[in-house]
Amino acid sequence: MAHLVWQDDLNTGIQVIDNQHKRIVEMINHLHDAQQGKEHAAIAEVIEELVDYTLSHFAFEETLMEDAGYQFSRAHKKIHELFIRRVSEYRVRFQAGEDVGDELKGLLSRWLFNHIRNDDAGYVDAVRHSMSELVKDKSEGGWLSRSMKRFFG
């Protein structure tokens, strides 16, 4: 498997999410490089980093969805939980001495791109709207400022 290449159709239009997704792609590519060098310690480090970063990315993404009132946020969170379980199983197998590199890279690349194009695409409008409302609210002085103007002129 060659390095994964970011494609424009993976962009959600939410810069912070796109940057996090690109970072995950970089980590998958680091896994490939470590595996090519047959560096067990480097592979272990990349797997741990991937799991940790993905967990924090999912938590961030889930918070954005919940804050936006995205109606399928609970189902989306379940998808994340199932994925983390699968990746954790690979981590355990690797720690037990099994060579799971190719299998894990295949899962990660297929799952990530499919997830972004299908599952993540579903929340984009709600989150972008929510974020624009926050920016608008802030530019208008926020709730307190508007309330003070309304009550005290």
Swiss-Prot record:
Organism: Pseudomonas aeruginosa (strain ATCC 15692 / DSM 22644 / CIP 104116 / JCM 14847 / LMG 12228 / 1C / PRS 101 / PAO1)
Gene3D superfamilies: Hemerythrin-like
Job of this protein: Oxygen-binding protein. May be involved in a storage mechanism or for delivery to oxygen-requiring enzymes. The oxygen-binding site contains two iron atoms.
Assembly behavior: Monomer.
Protein family: Belongs to the hemerythrin family.
Keyword Iron found: yes
UniProt keyword terms in alphabetical order: Iron, Metal-binding, Oxygen transport, Transport
Family matches, as HAMAP family: Hemerythrin
InterPro entries: Bacteriohemerythrin-like (IPR023504), Haemerythrin_Fe_BS (IPR016131), Hemerythrin (IPR050669), Hemerythrin-like (IPR012312), Hemerythrin-like_sf (IPR035938), Hemerythrin_metal-bd (IPR012827)
Residue sites binding Fe cation 1 per the record: 21, 57, 61, 120
Protein name: Bacteriohemerythrin
Residues that bind Fe cation 2: 61, 76, 80, 115, 120
A Pfam match: Hemerythrin
GO MF term list: iron ion binding; oxygen carrier activity
CDD domains: Hemerythrin
